[in-house]
């Protein structure tokens, strides 16, 4: 499966639905028959707890151990400690130990590529790798962007995101310049959209005004819902918890948009190979 696509779900602002999006996109892709690996790249471990592993401190193997082994060039079984969720996604979990690794990375050789080097050992087994980034633009997030083919940016509809987005786009530009020239922005996903669609419209307009039409905004928008907040305590996706809810339908629609991107990429790749 060398056609594996790695997507970083990224926004340095917290509370925009990054983890919820990673879970529901991941499970949505798995429901469509794709093999999916989720990476919790946040020391808070929200993705890990969202999927039902509450006591993150008791996990003996997390992303920290995987990356430490790469840094120290120790032999490792790269699949050891990968957790298997009942909704058919795999997870490299995280806990607070990841924040201490951030300091180690600063002095490591090829420090921006440690996560990329780890993923090269496992990604042939998967169609998609989704990285849930922490809400900051430090070295771990830089690693995620270096390892990724593309970025999905969840943005809260009630929040005019001009300033934060400028920072994030600046970081993406830096990554492109130094460590990952091919990094693409797949699009912006509007989340927590309430019934007042005018507010969502004004956010879309502000995004277009500030960032031009070159950044795509997904047609699917994720509605705000109390139920969606409840799901994170259940250890399941929205599909398992409330399959007919507006949030579930919105994430299913978003998953189809992401799959359509993947199919287009495959067609372009095939055409390129044929032309050679």
For each of these PLM feature ranges, what is it?
Residues 1-276:
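P-loop NTP-binding core
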């Amino acid at each position: 499966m060398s056609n594996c696509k790695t997507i970083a779900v990224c926004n340095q602002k917290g509370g925009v639905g990054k983890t919820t999006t990673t879970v529901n996109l991941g499970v949505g892709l798995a429901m469509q028959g794709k093999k999916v690996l989720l990476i919790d790249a946040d020391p808070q471990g929200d993705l890990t707890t969202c999927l039902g592993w509450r006591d993150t401190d008791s996990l003996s193997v997390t992303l920290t151990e995987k990356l430490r082994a790469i840094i120290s060039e120790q032999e490792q079984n790269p699949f050891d400690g990968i957790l298997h969720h009942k909704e058919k996604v795999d997870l490299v979990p995280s806990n607070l130990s990841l924040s201490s690794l951030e300091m180690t990375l600063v002095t490591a050789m090829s420090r921006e590529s440690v996560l990329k080097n780890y993923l090269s050992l496992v990604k042939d087994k998967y169609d998609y790798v989704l990285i849930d980034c922490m809400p900051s633009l430090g070295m771990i997030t830089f690693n995620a962007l270096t390892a990724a083919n593309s970025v999905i940016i969840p943005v809260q509809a009630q929040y005019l995101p001009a300033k934060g987005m400028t920072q994030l786009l600046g970081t993406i530009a830096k990554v492109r310049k130094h460590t990952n020239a091919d990094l693409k922005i797949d699009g912006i996903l509007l989340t927590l959209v309430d019934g007042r669609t005018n507010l969502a419209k004004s956010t879309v307009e502000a995004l277009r005004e500030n960032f031009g039409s070159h950044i795509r905004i997904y047609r699917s928008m994720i509605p705000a819902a109390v139920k969606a907040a409840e799901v994170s305590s259940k250890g399941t996706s929205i599909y398992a918890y409330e399959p007919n809810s507006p949030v579930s339908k919105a994430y299913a629609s978003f998953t189809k948009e992401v799959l359509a991107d993947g199919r287009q990429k495959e067609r372009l790749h095939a055409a390129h190979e044929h032309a050679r």
